[in-house]
């Protein structure tokens, strides 16, 4: 005699700090938010830090501002600043900050009573290191400090809300082939793997 039972549990999933998934640069945003294996650029800290080791010597920085869902709400935006510096031929460091503003929000309780106003915001600081492990292969690490304050410390049912703070890491690898020729043009192919936002929720 055998009795087999199964149970399925469905629960709503909640994503913490979803602004971390918003593309901070127009190039990757226009390509459908791809970036793990695209050619290296100053925004590689967000998509795959391992690519930083393949950037030219010296350094560069970028500043961007992106209105977010502006046809729905006029004052939500993502601001981003990032830069990198090559330490030598095989390694690079980078740093960046993303600031997400959710505009002005009026808070009410369950009965619709006014509780106050606040400009919710979230930000993340990134610090990255990338190194070539061979002529064609590299690895990278990003350390992040994440801050999210969506309520401004208002009181809900007698309890004061608090900002969320967390640390996270990204791990990435990148392989870039040697240059070869196709129809008279120099070409390369690349593979990239990036595991992002490993940390507490």
Q: Residue ranges of each PLM-predicted region?
A:
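Subset of outer-membrane beta-barrel
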Residues: 6-7, 11-201
């Amino acid at each position: 005699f055998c009795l087999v039972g199964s149970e399925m549990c469905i629960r709503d999933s909640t994503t913490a700090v979803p602004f971390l998934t918003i593309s901070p640069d127009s190039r990757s945003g226009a390509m459908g938010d791809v970036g793990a294996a695209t050619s290296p650029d100053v925004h590689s800290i967000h998509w795959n830090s391992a690519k930083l080791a393949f950037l030219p010597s010296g350094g560069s920085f970028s500043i961007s501002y992106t209105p977010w869902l502006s046809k729905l709400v006029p004052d939500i935006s993502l601001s981003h600043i990032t830069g990198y510096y090559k330490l030598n031929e095989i390694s690079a460091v980078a740093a960046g900050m993303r600031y997400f503003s959710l505009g002005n929000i009026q808070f009410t309780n369950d009965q619709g009573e006014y509780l106050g106003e606040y400009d919710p915001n979230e930000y993340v600081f990134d610090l990255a290191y990338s190194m070539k492990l061979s002529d064609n292969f590299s690895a990278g690490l990003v350390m992040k400090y994440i801050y999210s304050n969506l309520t401004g410390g208002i009181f809900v049912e007698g309890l004061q809300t608090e900002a969320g703070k967390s640390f996270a890491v990204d791990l990435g690898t990148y392989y870039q082939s040697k240059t070869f020729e196709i129809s008279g043009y120099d070409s390369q192919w690349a593979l990239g793997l990036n595991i992002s936002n490993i940390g507490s929720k």
